[in-house]
Amino acid sequence: MASQVNALLLPVIESTPLHQITKVALTTTLTSKQSDYKFKEIAVPLTKSLQLYEKAQRRQDLRASLKALESIIYQTHFQWNNPLPRHAHLFQKHYHFLLTHWPFENHRDLVDSIAVNNGKLNSTSSRSVWLKADWITLFNVKNPWVQTPPSLMRLSGTDLDTFTPERIFLINSLGNHYKFLIANSHLSYNHKKYPSPGVQIPVRNALGEVSPAKQIAQLFARQLSHIYKSLFIENPPLSPENELALTAVFYDETVERRLRRLYMRACARAYTTTNADSTTEPLMFHCTRWEVD
């Protein structure tokens, strides 16, 4: 199937006004050995964008044509051909640890604490708490609702819950990543505002009853899925290799001004890691800026 689809897509890619670096990246990604699922994950949205581009060209709709090309540029360099940062891989590796230690706020406990706090609601769910706090301290409490799957039961409780150097690196890198995106809201996907990442456990009724443990565990799973999608799929950091590739596009003297502007718009939300090779110090992030005419 992949070879047949590529036979249709590759000539269309070559006919676009995109820079050769983007064309090579696209071609390499499509023709590399990968599962059918992974291939479809790229080929389906790419086909849609190329169809939009061709239709816009026939209608001489410049705006729609440029929008389609912008989408292809962004998806090629930021998603399809962009290696995940180290803390994304660690997120997957230590998923169960994050699931059992992800910070939460139990609304029942929150209501009960009002009397102790002289009638004041002492919530920890505000973004300011997450922006100021040491993230390691936020992860110190293990939640009682997520059960350890049988496949992990062979590991000791210490192994499952210990704050190893790798896990500390992961948590602090996630904290830096979240704080960076909050501080640079112009980078967010569709101008989305990032809420407090803690899990909220609501009361079900006026009696203060909470949901069954299984439903609460699902809240943690959904929140981690949302966090991963927000940081690594919708708005991922640009890899150092891709930053260099795009820099070569911007400073290519043969590139016409219109095409350079197209790439500038497509890459307006670019940011990357300052210390991508670090394995001890948590990752830091900075906005990528290309000073071009």
Curated annotation (Swiss-Prot):
Keywords carried by this UniProt record: Mitochondrion
One Pfam family recorded for the sequence: GEP5
Subcellular location, record wording: Mitochondrion
One GO process term, biological-process aspect: mitochondrial genome maintenance
GO cellular component, as recorded: matrix side of mitochondrial inner membrane; mitochondrion
Disulphide-bridged cysteine pairs: none
Main location group: mitochondrion
Function per UniProt: Essential for respiratory growth and required for maintenance of mtDNA. Required for cell survival in the absence of prohibitins.
Annotated family: Belongs to the GEP5 family.
Protein name (Swiss-Prot/TrEMBL): Genetic interactor of prohibitin 5, mitochondrial
UniProt organism field: Saccharomyces cerevisiae (strain ATCC 204508 / S288c) (Baker's yeast)
The gene coding this protein: GEP5
